[in-house]
Curated annotation (Swiss-Prot):
Sequence positions bearing Phosphothreonine: T59
Compartments, as annotated in UniProt: Cytoplasm; Mitochondrion; Nucleus
Organism the protein comes from: Sus scrofa
Modified positions (Phosphotyrosine) in chain numbering: Y3
Pfam families cross-referenced by the UniProt entry: GST_C_3, GST_N
Protein's job: Conjugation of reduced glutathione to a wide number of exogenous and endogenous hydrophobic electrophiles. Involved in the formation of glutathione conjugates of both prostaglandin A2 (PGA2) and prostaglandin J2 (PGJ2). Participates in the formation of novel hepoxilin regioisomers. Negatively regulates CDK5 activity via p25/p35 translocation to prevent neurodegeneration.
Name of the molecule in the record: Glutathione S-transferase P
Length: 207
């Protein structure tokens, strides 16, 4: 396969791109980096971080740049410039919440979880609003075709359902959206695969 994902043995910042590739019927290679192999590899990585993504002779770092590249490659970037701008906006919103989530998981889980869960609805509400403004919430987050931001949002919502199983109860459109996208045949197969199931969400065992 032309694609290689180099990353730690977690879902982390790569599960959205893995779902995208699976749903687009692409195969890819996984180069798994362990705590032993990471220190010698780190100096060669552009920003001294992973994931590293290879598409033939193109090497990319930064998970959102990788998602946008795949969005352009597979026509998952809206149907026109206006939709593309909205897709970017949604993806930036996903990134904001993903950063908050990562801070909780890696720096403040025990002390901060209760407050995080309490404030979560206000962070989820914009996505419910976006769905409600697009075909009554029965389609995708932007327009009538799936975009790279949908895969990123789907992953974000699924990991929050693990953190707080009732987090989408107050958001019927988001709840239905997760069920609908998770039922897409290739995503459903990916989510049932041992690769996904056995890969921890985060690197420290907290989720």
């Amino acid at each position: 396969p032309p694609y290689t994902i180099t990353y730690f043995p977690v879902r982390g910042r790569c599960e959205a791109m893995r779902m995208l590739l699976a749903d687009q019927d692409q195969s890819w290679k996984e180069e798994v980096v362990t705590m032993e192999t990471w220190p010698p590899l780190k100096p060669s990585c552009l920003f001294r971080q992973l994931p590293k993504f290879q598409d033939g002779d193109l090497t990319l770092y930064q998970s959102n740049a990788i998602l946008r590249h795949l969005g352009r490659s597979f026509g998952l970037y809206g149907k026109d410039q206006k939709e593309a701008a909205l897709v970017d906006m949604v993806n930036d919103g996903v990134e904001d919440l993903r950063c908050k989530y990562a801070t909780l998981i890696y720096t403040n889980y025990e002390a901060g979880k209760e407050k995080y869960v309490k404030e979560l609805p206000e962070h989820l509400k914009p996505f419910e609003t976006l769905l409600s403004q697009n075909q009554g919430g029965q389609a995708f987050v932007v327009g009538s075709q799936i975009s790279f931001a949908d895969y990123n949002l789907l992953d974000l919502l699924r990991i929050h359902q693990v953190l707080n199983p009732s987090c989408l109860d107050a958001f019927p459109l988001l709840s239905a959206y997760v069920a609908r996208l998770s039922a897409r045949p290739k995503i459903k197969a990916f989510l049932a695969s041992p690769e996904h199931v056995n890969r921890p969400i985060n690197g420290n065992g907290k989720n």
